[in-house]
Structure formats: structure tokens, C-alpha cells
């Protein structure tokens, strides 16, 4: 893997696709074990989590599992705005359902807290979160997700669903913004 330049910023390789696949399998196994007696509804947060959600749901060993999608936005460029905008809301009845939110990354926790609060208004049986990436040093509110692929430092990353102003979501590996770039 070589460095790449997106919108004038240089990114270096960070997590290769093989390691991503290994962690997704581990997370799917944990979810399958924890939810073996239930019929969870997976809630994919678009746009960033679409690749993680697709790969995760294929490895979850729960034949009755369902998936749906919502969309929130909290980033402009490389920075979290601190304001979460709901772009596409929830359309399913989740009352009494076990919900597993699928996120690409949990950074400050702002989106996660607002999303959990929104879901709790609909009386689900439980709400858990699975994220591919978690920045524990950046967490300002809420709690750590129940299922985490990788704990990472507080640096800007892209690839494998994560973007910079819409670009680079399609990359199969994850890249980190080069320091002093």
C-alpha cells in the first residue's frame, strides 16, 4: 500500500483489508453469541457504515436478523462539527426490538448519544452499538460501543466507507492523514 492524496491532503496506509476482515469476523462472532436467542434489527448509519454493515451482516450467524438504514451527518472536511443532522430517519417500528446500531466510527460520541436518545423514544428492548473504529481519546459524551473492531488514536482516517468530502469511501483499506502533511 502506498500513500495517497485526496483533495490535496496526503494519507498513509493504516489498516489493511485483511486485518479489517479479521476484526469484522470477530465482531460478528461476538454478536452472534450474544444475540443467539433474539431477532435483532441492525440499524446501519449511512453513508460511512455501508461497507462495514454489508460485510458484518454476512458474517452474523443469525438467520432471522434484519437490517435497515438511517443517515446522519456530523462532519465537514476533516472535522466533526459537533452538530448532528438527521438526513434520513427511522421508518420501522422498533418497539420491543433488540437494536444493534452499525457505525463506521465513534469519535466524540455526539452522534451515538443523539441516535440512542432517538431510538429510546420508540421503546426498544435494548440498544447496542457495533463500530468498526473507536477513538477512546476523543470520546466526550456517552459510553464506549459494545462491539468494537479497532481502537484507534484521534487522527483523521478514510477508506473502507469513511470519506473526505465524499471521496475515498470505495478504498478497500483504511488510510490515516499523514502528520505534518
Outline where the language-model segments fall.
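PRPP-associated nucleotide enzymes
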Residues: 1-181
Amino acid at each position: 500500500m502506498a500513500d495517497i492524496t485526496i483533495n490535496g491532503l496526503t494519507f498513509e496506509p493504516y489498516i489493511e483489508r485483511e486485518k479489517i476482515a479479521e476484526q469484522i469476523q470477530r465482531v460478528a462472532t461476538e454478536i452472534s453469541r450474544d444475540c443467539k436467542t433474539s431477532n435483532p434489527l441492525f440499524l446501519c448509519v449511512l453513508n460511512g457504515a455501508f461497507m462495514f454493515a454489508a460485510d458484518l451482516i454476512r458474517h452474523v450467524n443469525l438467520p432471522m436478523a434484519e437490517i435497515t438504514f438511517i443517515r446522519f451527518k456530523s462532519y465537514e472536511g476533516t472535522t466533526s462539527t459537533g452538530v448532528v443532522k438527521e438526513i434520513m430517519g427511522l421508518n420501522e417500528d422498533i418497539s420491543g426490538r433488540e437494536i444493534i446500531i452499525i457505525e463506521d466510527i465513534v469519535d466524540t460520541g455526539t452522534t451515538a448519544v443523539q441516535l440512542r436518545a432517538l431510538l429510546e423514544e420508540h421503546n426498544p428492548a435494548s440498544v447496542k452499538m457495533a463500530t468498526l473504529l473507536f477513538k477512546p481519546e476523543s470520546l466526550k459524551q456517552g459510553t464506549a460501543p459494545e462491539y468494537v473492531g479497532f481502537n484507534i488514536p484521534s487522527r483523521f482516517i478514510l477508506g473502507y466507507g469513511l470519506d473526505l468530502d465524499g471521496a475515498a469511501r470505495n478504498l478497500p483499506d483504511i488510510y490515516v492523514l499523514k502528520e505534518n502533511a
